[in-house]
Amino acid sequence: LVNGSNARNYTFGLENGAEFHQIASDGGFLEQPVALTSVTLTPGERAEIIVDLSGYAEGDTVKLMDGNATVLSLNVTEEADAQTALPQTLNEIPELVTDGAAVQRFTLSGMSFMVNINGSQFDMDRIDVEQHLNETVIWEVRNAQDMMGSMIHPFHIHGVQFQVLSRDGAEPPQNEQGWKDTIAVYPGETVRLAVTFSEKGVFMYHCHILEHEDNGMMGQVSVQ
């Protein structure tokens, strides 16, 4: 599942409310399958899911929904020759060491065309953040609620896969504990990320709502 919309969020679930398993996020396999009845993707986020059809009969239809809208219909055909099972271990994800790590803070503010990060709009000729190659830095991303109101900002970083450390100080959901490059930051929320770049260069970070990105909710990090 890929949310390729410019601004719309999707909450996917099976029509009958049945359980499915998420096995991967933006950056690949999770450590283990995560049982869910719904998964929300903001623009730029990805998820791979497994739907178990073993309890259905030939001729049944299983629908993946976003609210009342049908996104996908699975038509059950004859029984498969091979019986398959979901592995309990999918991947080994090393935990990034953040003890003593520096902290970079980002405040996302505004709506519509009046948007910014840390009070500044994007400037191609400006480097906003500097980070050393292979250095793990905690990026603390806050979605400010101000006089203009607020909405979910999907925060995306180019050139890296990060780990989500916390949401408002709490452990992130299991399906957000794999490698990611886009994370939904809800109004008033602070999300902490462990970010380690393995390549040198200048990389952009931005809100993945295209209207926000195009109107300046974007910055640049130089990795040397």
Predicted features, each with a name:
Residues 1-2, 204:
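Conserved catalytic-core segments centered on acid/base and nucleophilic motifs
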Residues 21-34, 105-224:
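Active-site pocket scaffolds in enzymes
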Residues 2-100:
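Histidine- and aromatic-rich segments of cupredoxin/plastocyanin-like copper-binding domains
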